[in-house]
Amino acid sequence: MGGSDEKRMNFPLKVVDACCKIREKCNRPDFIIGYRLSPEEPFEPGITMTETIKLIKELVKKPIQFIHISQKNYFQETRRGEGKGTPRLQVIHEITKGKVALIEVGGLRTQSDFIKAINSGFSEFIAAGVSNMINKDLGTLLKENKGDKLEIELDPEHPEKYEMGRNVEFLHF
C-alpha cells in the first residue's frame, strides 16, 4: 500500500469503505461517518496539499457525512504543493462544497476569531478544541456575545478551573 500517492490512499479509503459496509450491514443509515486529517506536514518528506487534495477528491465520492480538518491555524495558507499561498481550507472547501460537510478546528480562541472563521465560508462547521477545554461555557458565551469573558490561555496553576482535573498539566499549547 506504499509508494505512489494512489497506493498510499488505499489504506484510508479501505478503512472508510469498511466502516460504510458495517453501517449498511447493521442497517444504521443514521450512523454518521467522517474522516479526520491534518492536511499538510511542515517537513520534507511529508504530506503536501497536492496529496491531501487527491485524497479528499476520493473521500467526497464515499457515503460519508463529513471531513474534519485539524490544523493549528484556521486560516493557515498552503506551504507547498497545489494551492500554495492560498488558505488550505479554501482549497479544500472548493472540493467538498455541496458534497460533504467540512468541519475545521484550528486555533480559534477569541470571539472575533470565531466570527472571522464563520464569515470566511471556508467550512460548514467549526470545531473548538482548546477554547472549549478552557471555557466550559464557550457556546453560551459566544451566543450571548460575551467574548470579553473568554479565557484564551490555559492557566496550569489553577487546574480546578477546568473539568480536566490534574490532566491539565499534560496539555501544551
Language model features with spans:
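Flavin-dependent oxidoreductase catalytic cores
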Residues: 1-173
